[in-house]
């Protein structure tokens, strides 16, 4: 199956680099593409290693809609992003820039979707995901959109509401009971709630600032508040993070849940 992942990002340079690295580490053997829709007026370029023939990364620097107006919501950004999805894409998934994804995220999700599809479902998600927060890492039941694998035609049909924080509800609610929630599904999404200093042993590695967009979808200023904080543009070149650092993030999850 051909999987198309969408990452909307704006002024969270180190988050985007980490999420990009998670995509490059995916072990999926089928076609898979990551669209990075950078909606900041500060353009980014990308520094990629040689990629296998089945793995693709697209960088879209676009901060305005079709009317040349600055995007006013995350939903509007996603509605433009899905216009880039090719006709041969089977599944659409969401690759939030501040979250992380185990190397088997796509492989496991596609396997689950294929089984669900046989029963007439249009989307698949495991019941649990990892929840990474200041107190550690836990397994939680959730409706987190990045854990859902959705038939591409359904996302294109239903689209997103032009809102922030609840923009996914249009397709999520539209699918209703066509989403198969797998109680035995492998948790592969690492959902971050806040970030901060990263240490490897006693060595300080980096600080990743994240500013959450959720929690107040009814406030029309929420999106402007988010953009006001998201001003981390780095060197304006998205570069994968070091292998040992992404391995340390993965080990943090695995060690606390074995």
Please place each PLM-identified region on the residue numbering.
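Short beta-strand-to-loop acidic/aromatic patch adjacent to the donor-nucleotide binding site
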Residues: 89-100
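Short beta-strand/loop segment that forms part of the nucleotide-sugar
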Residues: 31-41, 60-64
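Acidic donor-binding/catalytic loop of UDP-sugar-dependent glycosyltransferases
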Residues: 99-112
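Active-site nucleotide-sugar/metal-binding loop of Leloir-type enzymes
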Residues: 75-91
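Short, acidic, metal-binding catalytic loop of nucleotide-sugar glycosyltransferases
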Residues: 21-31
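C-terminal catalytic/acceptor-binding lobe
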Residues: 18, 162-258
């Amino acid at each position: 199956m051909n999987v198309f992942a969408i990452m909307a990002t704006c002024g969270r340079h180190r988050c985007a680099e980490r999420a990009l690295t998670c995509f490059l580490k995916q072990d999926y053997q089928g076609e898979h593409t990551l669209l990075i829709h950078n909606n900041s007026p500060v353009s980014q370029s990308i520094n990629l290693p040689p990629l296998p023939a089945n793995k693709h990364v697209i960088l879209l620097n676009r901060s305005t809609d079709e009317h040349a107006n600055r995007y006013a919501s995350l939903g509007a950004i996603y509605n433009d992003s899905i216009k880039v999805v090719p006709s041969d894409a089977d599944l659409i998934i969401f690759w939030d820039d501040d979250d992380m994804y185990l190397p088997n995220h796509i492989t496991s999700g596609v396997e689950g979707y294929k089984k669900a599809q046989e029963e007439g479902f249009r989307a698949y998600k495991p019941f649990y995901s990892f929840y990474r927060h200041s107190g550690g890492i836990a397994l939680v039941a959730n409706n987190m959109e990045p854990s859902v694998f959705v038939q591409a035609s359904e996302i294109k049909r239903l689209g997103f509401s032009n809102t922030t924080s609840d923009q996914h509800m249009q397709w999520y609610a539209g699918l209703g009971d066509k989403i198969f929630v797998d109680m035995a599904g492998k948790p592969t999404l690492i959902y971050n709630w806040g970030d901060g200093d990263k240490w490897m042993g006693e060595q300080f590695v980096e600080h990743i600032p994240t500013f959450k967009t959720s929690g107040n979808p009814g406030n029309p200023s929420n999106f402007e508040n988010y953009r006001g904080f998201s001003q981390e543009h780095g060197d304006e070149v998205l570069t994968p993070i070091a292998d040992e650092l992404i391995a340390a993030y993965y080990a943090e999850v695995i060690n606390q849940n074995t």
